[in-house]
Structure formats: C-alpha cells, structure tokens
Amino acid sequence: ARQVAGSTPVADVLNSATASMLDPISGGRHKVFGSVGLNVIPQTSTIGSHLPRAFGLAFALGRAAGADMTSSWPLDSVVVCSFGDASANHSTAVGALNASAYCAHQGLPLPVLYVCEDNGIGISTKSPAGWVARSLSSLPAIEYAAADGTKPIELLDTAQRLAELVRTQRRPAILHLKTVRF
C-alpha cells in the first residue's frame, strides 16, 4: 500500500474492522475490507461471496489483454483472492472455482491466484480431514500447491512460484495454506 500516495492502509483496515463511518468502502454501513485505490476487491462477512468477483475480474483482465483493450490495470496483473477452508464448500466459492476450471480447460486467460487459508475449523466446526485438499487439488486445469503457514520461507517460495505461473501463463492456481487458529 505504500506505493500509492496518500493511502492509509492501517487506518483503513481498522476503520473497516470497526465499521467506522471513515471506512473508505462501506462508510460504516458494514464491516467490509476493500480499497478502490489499492485495487482490493471488497470482502464481506458473507463467506465466499468475493470469489465470483475475483473470477470476474480475472476473466475481464484476460479478455482485455487479448482484445488489445486499454485498462487501468497493468496487463500482467494477477488477481489474488483469499478465503477460509469453510468457504471452500460454499456454493458461491464452488461456482467460482468451477468456472475457473472450465475457463482454464478451454485455454482462456484467467490470471487468478486463489489462497485457501485452512485452519481446519469452518467457523465453529472441524473441517473433515483431507476434504479441502482433495477437493481443491482435484479441480481440472488449475495448478494446486500446498504450503505450511508456520514455515515462512517454504510458504514464500511456493507463493512466488504460483504467482509467477499465474502472471506468465495467465491461468488460475490455488495455494492451499495450512494455518493456525488462535
């Protein structure tokens, strides 16, 4: 966020988390995290509702580059979308991931990196052992990699590899990130 003059990322996050009227996205109407100036797609408390938006943006970026259209975003932009392991089973998330696989299967450019933050607990219930890994890794035409969030060097290497793949090959990928819930 430091690269955008006048941005106040810490204040913006705190204003969002407290539903402050100073929140630049919601104006205090809802706890929403996002930023137009920083190109952060708003993420709401409705689980998985932002995945279709991320898919749509990646689809539009892919189409714009192929159609030689102008865009306010760099042509090598990558959409990054994080979600929790409980969201991986929500209909909106499943729909976005399936649409991503469908487009990738057809060779359509879709520069999106999905990051599943898996702490093994879906809101208040345990996620079935192995379910998230199996369902995410089985999506056709989507690159899948897992990393342990408690091992930052390994995580950084995996994340950089996937981001570079998405950026250069313009196809979707999933980073399945094992995390710890405090």
Spans of features found by a protein language model:
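Thiamine diphosphate
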Residues: 107-182
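Cofactor-binding active-site loop characterized by glycine-rich and histidine/acidic residues
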Residues: 1-110, 122-141
